[in-house]
Amino acid sequence: MQARYPVSSQSPLGVVPYIPGDQGFYRTATGGGYTGMPAPMSMYSHATHEQYPGGMARAYGPYAPAQQPKDMVKPPYSYIALITMAIQNSSDKKITLNGIYQFIMERFPFYRDNKQGWQNSIRHNLSLNECFVKVPRDDKKPGKGSYWTLDPDSYNMFENGSFLRRRRRFKKKDVLREKEDRDRQGKDNPGQACEQDAQQPVKLRDIKTENGACTPPHDSTPPLSTVPKTESPDRSGGSACSGSPQSQTPQQAFSMDTIMTGLRGSPQHAAELPASRAALPGSVSLTYSPTPQPAHYSPPCGQPATYHCNMQATSLYTGDRGHGDDTLPEYTNTTNASSISHPHQSSSQESQHLQQNRLAPWYLNQSGELGHLSASYPGQQQNFHAVREMFETQRIALNSSPVTGSNSCQMAFPSSQPLYRASGAFVYDCSKF
């Protein structure tokens, strides 16, 4: 019985033997089996033959190789663009008509056929467009035909140098008109430039004056927005920042002069305080100027009215960030509330002071945060412990004494305790936290 399929040769690689290219793309079986069964294609070669035989160049055997389809597509360039390419590609930036034909046919195979049609279009575009200038041939060079070149003003007729996009049809009269307009504007510009130069110093001076950094006579006081919650202990500076009269300063802020005079007992330290504070611009201020609020504002009934604030932590942090170490002992004092404990002061101002002191709890006595300052400021630490013991005794005395007053929002100020206020059994002691 004869085999239906051809048996391949016993080669070490087990591939189909080489089939010559003249047998076509397909070949039928050699036996008497199914004659229509396709056999392996000729693209498979024998191991001993070269990897890519010459017969593979022809895809369909006896047929001639077809031209690539992309060469038969018309280029997306206009005839003006093609002529411009040919002129710019030449060495002298000028070319004959025959040179234009040769350039187009070499670069674009599409124009190798139907030469009569597109060559006629090339001649029409050379004659009708003003961007192409005809240059007579020099007698020294042999040949016939004139040269064609580009008008010097037409080099920018294509957008960004792309031959696919042309701005507009080049016309010589439009170019002349544009030149006249530019010349006219150039004559008018010097007068405008002089006027602008004459007005420019005035504008710059006005801008500098508005910014507040122009002339030396102006006050260089920083604006209120830069220091919203701190102010200098000087009464005149505090009144200027808060916008209140100088007579109201002792009622709206702590009076550091009276505190330092009362505790130190020497007016010299009180006189040196404003000067020493001026040397530390970035320090935390010990005086608070509350923002003015309506007179009918009152704290809630359950709000504690008695508090003990020790601002020594503030002074220590101030000394850590300050510039002078000799002025630090001036700040190691407890805050005296005598100015706000006056019996005739309104409850709204007292509540404002209470809220201002509540806003900065992290400055107050915290042993964990002040531990790293003990080595640098031993004198301040000793004074701090002494003041704390004094506050402890006052707190114990307040807790043991009977409470005077009612449950209303009115605050009572006992005459025996001029430095502290108490309206209930609850005592808010900042020094123990």
Curated annotation (Swiss-Prot):
Keywords: DNA-binding, Nucleus, Transcription, Transcription regulation. Residues 174-250, 318-355 are annotated as: Disordered. Residues 239-250 have a biased composition (Polar residues). Residues 338-355 have a biased composition (Low complexity). One of its GO terms (cellular component) is nucleus. InterPro entries: Fork_head_dom, FOX_domain-containing, FOXC1/C2-like_FH, TF_fork_head_CS_1, TF_fork_head_CS_2, WH-like_DNA-bd_sf, WH_DNA-bd_sf. One of its GO terms (biological process) is anatomical structure morphogenesis. It is found in: Nucleus. Residues 74-168 bind DNA. CDD domains: FH_FOXC1 (cd20044). One of its GO terms (molecular function) is RNA polymerase II cis-regulatory region sequence-specific DNA binding. It holds the Pfam family Forkhead. It comes from the Eukaryota. Residues 174-187 have a biased composition (Basic and acidic residues). Monomer. DNA-binding transcriptional factor that plays a role in a broad range of cellular and developmental processes such as eye, bones, cardiovascular, kidney and skin development. Acts either as a transcriptional activator or repressor. Binds to the consensus binding site 5'-[G/C][A/T]AAA[T/C]AA[A/C]-3' in promoter of target genes. Upon DNA-binding, promotes DNA bending. Required for cell viability and resistance to oxidative stress in the eye. Promotes cell growth inhibition by stopping the cell cycle in the G1 phase through TGFB1-mediated signals. This is Forkhead box C1-B. It comes from Danio rerio (Zebrafish).
